[in-house]
A protein has these predicted regions:
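Conserved catalytic cores of phosphodiester-cleaving nucleases, focusing on short active-site segments
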Residues: 109, 114-120
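Nucleic-acid endonuclease domains
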Residues: 1-105, 120-196
Length: 196
């Protein structure tokens, strides 16, 4: 079950919680899979980093793959908390209207009445070209992202708004926690967004 009710989100607090994740290496250990997803779905109900760490320990400390499960659950928690906060950032803007059905898998919000599924992603190493090429050829990157992401539960070909993060040192994932910075970028983008 995924909860998307972020009525009173304190972005500063969420940013602090997300940055606690930086203390551990960010590695998945495996491709996202439904079995480990179901075992770690509790991450959707816990906003506090220390609480999620404690729950992971309680659930998996005797499991032979404890470290892998820990990394997997922490990464899912981190990505979920960041995605919900970024969605909240979009919804704060006057040009955006939130969806009425929080369980809608194909859209997160509307911009000028056009539905979008928001996806925050790190710059994909599998794209095969550098970030400068992607900036000059955004349609090619968007096409690659459509084809190569969300192969599991959320695949669809509806409108998506990709927020792609890149950091020169390769630590792209850390940018998902920089919510105050992301808010400036999103507001700048939406302020210049024009109805088609």
């Amino acid at each position: 079950m995924i909860f998307r009710s972020f009525a009173a989100v304190n972005l500063e607090l969420v940013e602090i919680q997300l940055k606690k994740r930086w203390a551990s290496e960010y590695k998945w250990g495996r491709k996202q899979a439904d079995i480990w997803d179901s075992q770690t779905n509790f991450i959707y109900t816990i906003a506090d980093f220390d609480e999620v760490v404690a729950r992971i320990y309680t659930e998996f400390n005797t499991h032979r793959k404890y470290e892998d499960l820990r990394n997997y659950a922490l990464n899912r928690w981190y990505n979920f908390q960041s995605a919900m906060a970024v969605e909240h950032i979009f919804n704060l803007h006057s040009k955006v209207r939130r969806v009425k059905n929080d369980k809608d898998r194909e859209k997160d919000f509307y911009i000028y009445g056009v539905a979008f599924d928001h996806k925050t992603s790190v710059f994909p190493s599998g794209f095969g070209k550098d970030v400068d090429y992607a900036v000059d050829n955004p349609r090619e990157l968007a096409k690659w992202l459509y084809v190569n992401q969300s192969e599991q539960q959320r695949f669809h070909a509806k409108n998506r708004l990709f927020l792609v993060l890149h950091k020169k040192d390769g630590q792209h994932w850390k940018l998902k926690a920089e919510l105050s910075w992301i808010k400036v970028l999103v507001d700048t983008y939406l302020d210049s967004y024009r109805e088609l």
